[in-house]
């Protein structure tokens, strides 16, 4: 599950900083282990070189690009489906954190918490169960408009948001060359998120939990 944080209003970000520092440390450890596993499996990669080319934190895409450069695969998708597949035993998945803990941390800094593209991660029958648990922690909104949603997905998300008294959000999930089929803002061509969504999110009152 992906939780988006927007519109932080407090000046004390200590809990956010502490959480992110811990996550960065865990990610660095898993990245080093992945590089070690790749090299032991015969896929020559240089982790220092991967880090130098990455803007920000290193993720699976950066490893895929290194494998492309070294001639093992031709595309990032091929890497995800083969060498870097979670089923092959080489890839080291990130250590998951509780969505509820993330929501609490966002609220500690006066932020607005949004469940991103829920129908990508959850089945329709699972979403109400999650929202029932997440709402008391301070979840503010869900993404009802998303690049890969069809009309039925959007209508279902709208009805769920209204049922649980949540604000609505939307996003293209643009990731540059990593998702070439998605354009910034317009998604796959038919996405038009109302500006009113952003205004309501920014104006929302943050409740302490």
Predicted feature locations:
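Conserved phosphoryl-transfer catalytic core
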Residues: 25-50
């Amino acid at each position: 599950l992906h939780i988006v944080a927007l519109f932080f209003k407090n000046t004390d970000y200590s809990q956010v900083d502490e959480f992110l520092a811990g996550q960065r440390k865990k990610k660095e450890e898993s990245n080093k282990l992945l590089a070690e596993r790749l090299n032991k499996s015969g896929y020559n990669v240089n982790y220092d070189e991967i880090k130098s080319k990455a803007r920000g934190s290193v993720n699976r895409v950066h490893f895929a690009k290194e494998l492309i450069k070294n001639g093992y695969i031709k595309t990032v998708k091929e890497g995800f489906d083969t060498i870097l597949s979670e089923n092959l035993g080489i890839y080291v998945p990130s250590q998951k954190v509780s969505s509820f803990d993330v929501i609490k941390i966002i609220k500690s800094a006066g932020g607005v918490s949004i469940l991103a593209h829920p129908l990508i991660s959850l089945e329709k029958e699972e979403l109400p169960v999650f929202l029932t648990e997440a709402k008391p922690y301070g979840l503010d909104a869900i993404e009802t408009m998303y690049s890969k949603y069809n009309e039925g997905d959007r209508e279902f998300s709208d009805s769920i948001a209204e049922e649980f008294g949540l604000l609505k959000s939307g996003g293209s999930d643009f990731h540059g060359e990593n998702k070439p089929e998605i354009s910034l803002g317009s998604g796959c061509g038919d996405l038009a998120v109302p500006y009113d969504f952003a205004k309501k999110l920014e104006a929302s009152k943050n409740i302490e939990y």
